[in-house]
């Protein structure tokens, strides 16, 4: 301040030098800042510091070798104590919940219950399988209209004695022959040793006067001609097979007799074939 008054020139006599002490807040701020300084952290010497060096020191430095012996463990097992293993108590029966109690006392009752459940399940599955198989097989069977067409009713009074009438049955010719008494006696007297396909006449008819046959030659499937041939029965014009009045092969290349279908007499005047 004195230096400023000396350099002021003409204003020097007017100016006077004075000094006054002013309290500054810088010291207080410095003291407050010094009091708030935290102390350096103290490390726990017992707790290891995780670093690259400490972790590498715990790793294996040599190849792992498995040793087996009487007093040497064959493997190393690490136990995880933080895993909670369930005891399945919710799924166990009340008889086996007590660990201190033997389960042999209730084993018979538990076995009987298991057997009953198994048997009931097996019966149910079997019944369901039966229903499924029955429905599947019934779906493959012929319908009612097809079964109705598979049978044919024939009025026998429309066929005179000694005549043969042909019908269509299941797409095949059906022969119904009203035989005379002479034809019945003649066919019954034929020796079986003379036949290529031995079969007695009475085994091929239900009533001797009615002969019902499928009119398809057993050689290659041609339709024979009735009341023709060397034996007065049926003759196949394709390859010359001769059948008698009972439909049995007597001559020619046919190996078997004419087929006899399934039929039933509803009355003396009505027969159902099929």
Curated annotation (Swiss-Prot):
Disulphide linkage map? 222-238
Q: Name one GO molecular function term.
A: 2 iron, 2 sulfur cluster binding
Signal peptide positions are: none
Q: Which residues bind [2Fe-2S] cluster?
A: 217, 219, 236, 239, 241
Q: How is it modified after translation?
A: Proteolytic processing is necessary for the correct insertion of UQCRFS1 in the complex III dimer. Several fragments are generated during UQCRFS1 insertion, most probably due to the endogenous matrix-processing peptidase (MPP) activity of the 2 core protein subunits UQCRC1/QCR1 and UQCRC2/QCR2, which are homologous to the 2 mitochondrial-processing peptidase (MPP) subunits beta-MPP and alpha-MPP respectively. The action of the protease is also necessary for the clearance of the UQCRFS1 fragments.
Which cofactors does this gene product need?
[2Fe-2S] cluster
Cofactor note text? Binds 1 [2Fe-2S] cluster per subunit. Fe-S cluster delivery to the Rieske protein is mediated by components of the iron sulfur (Fe-S) cluster assembly machinery that reside in the mitochondrial matrix (including HSC20 and LYRM7).
Q: Where is this region: Disordered?
A: 29-49
Protein topology in the membrane: Single-pass membrane protein
Q: What is this protein called?
A: Cytochrome b-c1 complex subunit Rieske, mitochondrial
Is Plastid among this UniProt entry's keywords?
no
Miscellaneous comment text of the record: The Rieske protein is a high potential 2Fe-2S protein.
Reactions this protein catalyses:
a quinol + 2 Fe(III)-[cytochrome c](out) = a quinone + 2 Fe(II)-[cytochrome c](out) + 2 H(+)(out)
Intervals, Mitochondrial intermembrane compartment = 141-274
- The Rieske domain covers 187-272
Query: What sections of the protein cross the membrane?
Result: 104-140
Keywords for this protein = 2Fe-2S, Disulfide bond, Electron transport, Iron, Iron-sulfur, Membrane, Metal-binding, Mitochondrion, Mitochondrion inner membrane, Respiratory chain, Transit peptide, Translocase, Transmembrane, Transmembrane helix, Transport
């Amino acid at each position: 301040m004195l230096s400023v008054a000396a350099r002021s020139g003409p204003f020097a006599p007017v100016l006077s030098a004075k000094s006054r002490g002013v309290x500054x807040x810088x010291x207080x701020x410095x003291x407050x800042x010094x009091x708030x300084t935290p102390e350096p952290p103290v490390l726990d010497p017992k707790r290891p510091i995780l670093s690259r060096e400490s972790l590498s020191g715990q790793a294996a430095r040599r190849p792992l070798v498995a040793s087996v012996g009487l007093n040497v463990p064959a493997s190393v097992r690490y136990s995880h104590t933080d895993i909670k293993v369930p005891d399945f108590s919710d799924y166990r029966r009340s008889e086996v919940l007590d660990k201190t109690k033997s389960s042999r006392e209730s084993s018979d009752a538990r076995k009987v219950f298991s057997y009953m459940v198994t048997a009931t399940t097996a019966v149910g599955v079997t019944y369901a399988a039966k229903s499924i198989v029955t429905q599947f097989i019934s779906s493959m069977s012929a319908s009612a209209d097809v079964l109705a067409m598979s049978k044919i009713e024939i009025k026998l009074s429309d066929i005179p004695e000694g005549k043969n009438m042909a019908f269509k049955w299941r797409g095949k010719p059906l022969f119904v022959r009203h035989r005379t008494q002479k034809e019945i006696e003649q066919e019954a007297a034929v020796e079986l040793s003379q036949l290529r396909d031995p079969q007695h006449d009475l085994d091929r008819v239900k009533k001797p006067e009615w002969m019902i046959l499928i009119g398809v030659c057993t050689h290659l499937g041609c339709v024979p001609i009735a009341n023709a041939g060397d034996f007065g029965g049926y003759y196949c014009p394709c390859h010359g097979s001769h059948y008698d009045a009972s439909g049995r092969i007597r001559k020619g290349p046919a190996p078997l007799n004419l087929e006899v279908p399934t039929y039933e007499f509803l009355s003396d005047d009505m027969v159902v074939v099929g």
